[in-house]
């Protein structure tokens, strides 16, 4: 990975992986990539293989109790985590350690907001049958899942988490207001979007969006967002529509 300048106290992501060459990947493109080049955020891939044992740098072993696959060894992972921890706060609120795992809690926008408000993050990319539970417990790792599907490793999931998080860092997006009107920012899916031409193959832009009446446009967008959320994500709608408890 190419070294980039880093502004003082820039938000930093440390990624423990067997495939450091896969980073920054898509994060090196577009706005997140430009922000990385400018030093608005920093990325430090950590090669787990360098902490392996023996001539072949072994990082895994067979599961205790039998079964298929291999498990990442706790001693190997601990050495990588100790290196990653250098210069970082001990408080997990200031610097979460996140293990990308299919059994973790679902990753949500509020998690991205929480991570972005921290000083940085350490992401652990699993492989094979995962990581020894003892090191997960000992280091207070937070387990996050990016969807109900099993991947071959955590690298793609890590890039997803970083993309959602780094775009919330001040200065990364050209227009900070755009983050306030996106899907999930207020618990709803985003309303439909349109642009020129006004008539495309007989399909026209809803007249209210061309009316110039900002109040009516806002009402239309809110109604559309609510309807889409009810139809496509009833699980989100239940949370939004739930009456607030009086303080």
Swiss-Prot record:
Keyword Transferase carried by entry: yes
Annotated catalysed reactions: guanosine(37) in tRNA + S-adenosyl-L-methionine = N(1)-methylguanosine(37) in tRNA + S-adenosyl-L-homocysteine + H(+)
Gene Ontology cellular component list: cytosol
EC number: 2.1.1.228
Alphabetized GO MF terms: tRNA (guanine(37)-N1)-methyltransferase activity
Keyword tags: Cytoplasm, Methyltransferase, S-adenosyl-L-methionine, Transferase, tRNA processing
Subcellular location, record wording: Cytoplasm
UniProt main location, coarse: cytoplasm
Binding positions for S-adenosyl-L-methionine per the UniProt entry: 126
Domain of life, source organism: Bacteria
KW Repressor (keyword) present: no
GO BP terms, alphabetized: tRNA N1-guanine methylation
Broad enzyme group: transferase
Pfam families with a match to the protein in the record: tRNA_m1G_MT (PF01746)
Record-linked PANTHER family: TRNA (GUANINE-N(1)-)-METHYLTRANSFERASE
Protein function: Specifically methylates guanosine-37 in various tRNAs.
HAMAP family noted in UniProt: TrmD
Protein family (similarity comment): Belongs to the RNA methyltransferase TrmD family.
Oligomeric form and interacting partners: Homodimer.
Name this protein carries in UniProt: tRNA (guanine-N(1)-)-methyltransferase
